[in-house]
From Swiss-Prot:
Keywords: Cytoplasm, GTP-binding, Hydrolase, Magnesium, Metal-binding, Nucleotide-binding, Potassium, tRNA processing
Gene: mnmE
Binding-site list for Mg(2+): 230, 251
Family: Belongs to the TRAFAC class TrmE-Era-EngA-EngB-Septin-like GTPase superfamily. TrmE GTPase family.
Cited PANTHER family: TRNA MODIFICATION GTPASE GTPBP3, TRNA MODIFICATION GTPASE GTPBP3, MITOCHONDRIAL
NCBIfam families hit by this protein: mnmE_trmE_thdF (TIGR00450), PRK05291.1-3 (NF003661), small_GTP (TIGR00231)
Species name: Enterobacter sp. (strain 638)
The protein's name in its UniProt record: tRNA modification GTPase MnmE
């Protein structure tokens, strides 16, 4: 497949609807307009026309929009046909267009890919299109739109420009060592480097917020049978998502709920009670529970407050704690406070968070919601914020590491050449976000996750 091909795809969701849109982009778009419409519409005006078959009979009628390149979404000639949204009608029209030479069905995300390749969008903006479509909350949608409008890219580009200026200064000091002013030791480079590092830290903090909005937080509820795990899932979900009985081992498989806390997506996972099980089905459920625990962002360790007064997880169940991944955050949830009379609320026990609540009555559950939000550093007021993906966080972290290494070289040995190289690598890491330095393989993976007509 070539980027010189003319591509066509349905731009509206499959199925029946009031309107169905076909989008065509490429050199042959003009020929499609003349063949199907009988004329070339006036650029950027809505023209109501019949959509004709090869023999001149009308297949449909609707709005035609003509956007000659480079003033179009893709930067190429683009034709949009907006007809009726019946799948049969759209299929007939699509088949008609594909009878013309030089046209093919677009790959997923190929329209956005062409916009990127033709400098209509950078890579972060192109990704924001998919994120806007997939947004699961109002806040996520607003942040995705900010990214599409360039909020994230602008911040990254400012960092790249600052690094470029700093590299020029450092390399001038290297190339002209006999000058009276020692650029490397006069403090100016260190001051500029500190400014860039502080700006990068601010962008990283906002990117983590944006990643939380997009990816969400995976929270696994784990503990012994009958500790109240399913009751807590229901309390957090606000509905009867799980069956709750007094019979130990009622939950035998993984249950998932997706909720939002002040805009932050939360993936809650209820698991089978952990114990030595002789029943094969329950044993499989317990193994699945451990698989989810190992992939969690946080574990809610449910404890039946009527069975123990211990609050330290190592005292409550040392074998469970020993099996957990080393850096996995734990919140001990002492349940059934309505029966024990314990004081509700959050406290700290040996570096672990402890919360007392009643999953049955809902008392203390709001404290848990706030704790989950705060534990991830999530801020509800993100006006002007942007969405970020995991690869963006990795690129920002790589850039920060290179700047740390560069500063160490500057302060330790006044090694200008090594500092300049670390600045170059940091600049390259940041440029991967916007696509200035990005492999073709990565581009393929990114755009293949898009909708067909985007």
């Amino acid at each position: 497949m070539s980027h010189n091909d003319t591509i066509v795809a349905q731009a509206t969701p499959p199925g029946r609807g009031g309107v169905g849109i076909l989008r065509i982009s490429g050199l042959k778009a003009r020929e499609v307009a003349e063949a199907v419409l009988g004329k070339l519409p006036k650029p950027r005006y809505a023209d109501y026309l019949p959509f004709n078959d090869a023999d001149g009979t009308a297949l449909d009628q609707g709005i035609a929009l003509w956007f000659p390149g480079p003033n179009s979404f893709t930067g190429e000639d683009v034709l949009e046909l907006q007809g009726h949204g019946g799948p049969v009608i759209l299929d007939l029209l699509l088949k008609r267009i594909l009878t013309l030479p030089g046209l093919r069905i677009a790959k997923p995300g190929e329209f956005s890919e062409r916009a990127f390749l033709n400098d209509k969008l950078d890579l972060a903006q192109a990704e924001a299109i998919a994120d806007l479509i997939d947004a699961s909350s109002e806040q996520a949608a607003r942040s995705a739109l900010n990214s599409l409008q360039g909020a994230f890219s602008t911040r990254v580009n400012h960092l790249v420009e600052a690094l470029t200026h700093l590299r020029i200064y450092v390399e001038a000091a290297i190339d002209f060592p006999d000058e009276e002013i020692d650029f490397l030791s006069d403090g100016k480079i260190e001051a500029q480097l500190n400014t860039v590092m502080a700006d990068l830290d601010a962008v990283r903090a906002e990117a983590r917020q944006g990643s939380l909005l997009r990816e969400g937080m995976k929270v696994v509820i784990a503990g012994r049978p009958n500790a109240g795990k399913s009751s807590l899932l229901n309390a957090l979900a606000g509905r009867e998502a799980a069956i709750v009985t007094d019979i130990a081992g009622t939950t035998r498989d993984v249950l998932r709920e997706h909720i939002h806390i002040d805009g932050m997506p939360l993936h809650i996972i209820d698991t089978a009670g952990l114990r030595d099980a002789s029943d094969e089905v329950e044993r499989i459920g317990i193994e699945r529970a451990w698989q989810e625990i190992e992939q969690a962002d946080r574990v809610l360790f449910m404890v039946d407050g009527t069975t123990t007064s211990a609050v330290d997880p190592a005292d409550i169940w040392p074998d469970f704690i020993a099996r957990l991944p080393a850096k996995l955050p734990i919140t001990v949830v002492r349940n059934k406070a309505d029966m024990t009379g314990e004081t509700l609320g959050l406290s700290d026990v040996n570096g672990h968070s402890l919360i007392r609540l009643s999953a049955r009555t809902g008392e203390g559950v709001e404290d848990l919601r706030n704790h989950l939000k705060q534990s991830m550093g999530f801020e509800t007021n993100m006006e002007g914020g942007f969405l970020a993906r995991r690869r963006h966080l990795q690129a920002l972290e790589a850039a920060a590491n290179h700047l740390d290494q560069g500063k160490a070289q500057l302060l330790g040995a006044w090694a200008g050449e090594l500092l300049a190289e670390e600045l170059r690598l940091a600049q390259q890491s940041l440029s991967e976000i916007t696509g200035e330095f990005t492999s073709d393989d990565l581009l393929g993976r990114i755009f293949s996750s898009f909708c067909i007509g985007k």
